[in-house]
From Swiss-Prot:
Keyword GTP-binding annotated: no
Major location (coarse): other
Organism: Homo sapiens (Human)
InterPro entries on file: MAGE, MAGE_WH1, MAGE_WH2, MHD_dom
Keywords per UniProt: DNA-binding, Growth regulation, Nucleus, Transcription, Transcription regulation
Gene3D superfamilies hit by this protein: MAGE homology domain, winged helix WH1 motif, MAGE homology domain, winged helix WH2 motif
Pfam entry (one): MAGE
Encoding gene (name): NDN
Protein name in UniProt: Necdin
Domain MAGE residue range list: 98-297
Protein role: Growth suppressor that facilitates the entry of the cell into cell cycle arrest. Functionally similar to the retinoblastoma protein it binds to and represses the activity of cell-cycle-promoting proteins such as SV40 large T antigen, adenovirus E1A, and the transcription factor E2F. Necdin also interacts with p53 and works in an additive manner to inhibit cell growth. Also functions as a transcription factor and directly binds to specific guanosine-rich DNA sequences.
Protein's UniProt keywords contain Nucleus: yes
Extra remark: Located in the Prader-Willi syndrome (PWS) chromosome region. Prader-Willi syndrome is a contiguous gene syndrome resulting from deletion of the paternal copies of the imprinted SNRPN gene, the necdin gene, and possibly other genes within the chromosome region 15q11-q13.
Disordered, as annotated region: 1-96
Amino acid sequence: MSEQSKDLSDPNFAAEAPNSEVHSSPGVSEGVPPSATLAEPQSPPLGPTAAPQAAPPPQAPNDEGDPKALQQAAEEGRAHQAPSAAQPGPAPPAPAQLVQKAHELMWYVLVKDQKKMIIWFPDMVKDVIGSYKKWCRSILRRTSLILARVFGLHLRLTSLHTMEFALVKALEPEELDRVALSNRMPMTGLLLMILSLIYVKGRGARESAVWNVLRILGLRPWKKHSTFGDVRKLITEEFVQMNYLKYQRVPYVEPPEYEFFWGSRASREITKMQIMEFLARVFKKDPQAWPSRYREALEEARALREANPTAHYPRSSVSED
C-alpha cells in the first residue's frame, strides 16, 4: 500500500489520487464508540424522600423540518439504535480494513441503486458492515468520499425516520448527458476516470497504469464484478466498440503491452475543458494544477467558439484569465 501511495503523490499522475485522499480523509474519527454520541440522556434518580414526578412525555425528533439535522446524520452515519449495555469492544481495526469495508459498501450501494432497490442503513450493517458497526461513521464517510470523487455521486440520507439512503448525481447534468451510456451512472464514472487518466498522461495511458487506478477502486482484470461484470471485457471491448476508447498494442515492446487512447466518440461528445472540470471537482484542485493540460483545454475551447460562435456549449466554471 505504501508503494501505491508514493506513486499517487505525483500531480501528473493525479488520476490515481483518490486512494491517498480516501486513506487519510481529514476529519474522519477512527474507532469512536457510538455510545459517545448516540446514547440517550438519562433522567437523574429520585432521592429517597423526593416526591414522585410524572415522567415527561417522549418528544419525537423534529428531523423532517431540520435540513441541517438530516445532513449531519448523513455525514455522521448515525446508528439506527442506541447501543445496549456497555461491553468491552473489539480492538480498533487497521485503516486498511476500514478502507476495504468502504469499498465493499460502495459497490453494495451501487448495485442496490442499479437495481432500483431501497438502500436501508440496517441492510448495510447486516450485509456489509457487520462486526464493524462501531466504526460505521468512518466507513460511511470513506464510502461517500469515494462515490463523490470517482463516480460523481453523493450518498445522501433521505429519511432519518427509516434510515433510508439514496445516490444523488453530483456532476452537472449537461456533462453526464453528453456521455450516452443509457443512464448507467457507475459505468459513466468509470469511463470518465479512464478518459481523465489518458488526458493527464498526455497521449495515451498504458494498460498497466489504468489497472493501477482500477485496483484502487477494488476492480481486478480477472475477477467478475457485481456491477460491471467482466471489467476487462468492458474496457477493452465494449468501450472500444462504442468508440469511446482505442485499445492498441505498443509497438516494438516485448512482452506485448497495450495502451488506451481517446476514441472518436469521446472526442465528439466530451470536451477537454469538461475533463478539466471533472478532475478539479474529483480531486478538489484548481485546474491549473495540470498546467499543460489546462492550456490545451483553453485552446480547444477558444477554437470551438471561433469555429461555431452560435453553437451551444456547456457553460464552463473555469476561468480563462
